[in-house]
């Protein structure tokens, strides 16, 4: 195998001394699992995406799984998603016992082909799960029109789109439920982690239960649903807050 003199990374996380300081202070506080930084990060991220509610989770993949279940999508239901995307999209659908309906890609945008999408809608279709690919936003005007016409949920996977916009509106603000990833190669990172945003309080409350093992409200160990341990840590939130402070300059640098 030929060895190259220089290694050019696909991505390198942009971390600075403010990030180190934020995490260090949180470590010294002793609040390394739960803590106030989580709620602060959720509030600021909700504001940033123009959504009412935000909930931190352990990864972008976890966010997708919870998003599906929060909408009561399950056995016998179909969810349309692009064939060209990370496996997490289809996995989230399958793990919730629904059926992924794969649609090919538009060669100009790398996103889902809208003409083919329309042909795949059936009486069993409950939602569209649409990631924006490689920084190119989907045509959200057409997508939202389709969802309204067929009464479908829109799960917007904005994992690669933090800070990106479609017609001056922030990506991740279009979905009934929208998800984000904070993996090391994303615009802002917490090492691992994800976020789910929505304007629906009932859905938000269900998301918070599902990510925390669906503990009972009155009797903690009476679980009224099957949830996951998909929690986010106070340490991650501290890093996320610091990163979010400079999202504009991060996106600007990527454009260059």
Language-model region placement:
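Active-site region of PLP-dependent enzymes
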Residues: 161-167, 174-256
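Short, conserved catalytic or interaction motifs in soluble domains
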Residues: 59, 105, 133, 184, ...
């Amino acid at each position: 195998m030929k060895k190259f003199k220089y290694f050019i990374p696909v991505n390198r996380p942009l971390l600075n001394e403010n990030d180190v300081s934020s995490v260090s202070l949180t470590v010294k506080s002793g609040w390394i699992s739960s803590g106030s930084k989580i709620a602060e990060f959720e509030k600021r991220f909700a504001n940033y995406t123009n959504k009412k509610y935000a909930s931190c989770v352990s990864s972008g993949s976890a966010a997708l799984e919870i998003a599906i279940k929060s909408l009561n999508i399950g056995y016998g239901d179909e969810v349309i998603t692009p064939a060209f995307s990370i496996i997490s999209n289809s996995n989230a659908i399958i793990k919730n016992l629904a059926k992924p309906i794969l649609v090919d890609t538009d060669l100009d945008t790398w996103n889902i082909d809208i003409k083919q999408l329309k042909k795949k809608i059936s009486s069993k279709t409950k939602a569209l799960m649409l990631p924006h690919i490689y920084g190119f936003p989907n045509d959200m005007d057409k997508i939202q029109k389709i969802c309204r016409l067929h009464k479908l949920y829109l799960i917007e996977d904005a994992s690669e789109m933090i800070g990106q916009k479609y017609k001056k509106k922030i990506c991740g603000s279009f979905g009934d439920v929208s998800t984000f990833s904070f993996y090391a190669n994303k615009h802002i990172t917490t090492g691992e982690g994800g976020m789910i945003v929505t304007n629906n309080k009932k859905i938000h409350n269900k998301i918070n239960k599902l990510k925390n093992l669906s503990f009972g409200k009155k009797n903690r160990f009476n679980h009224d649903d099957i949830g996951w341990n998909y929690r986010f840590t106070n340490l991650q939130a501290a890093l996320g807050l610091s990163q979010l402070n400079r999202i504009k300059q991060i996106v600007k640098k990527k454009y260059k």
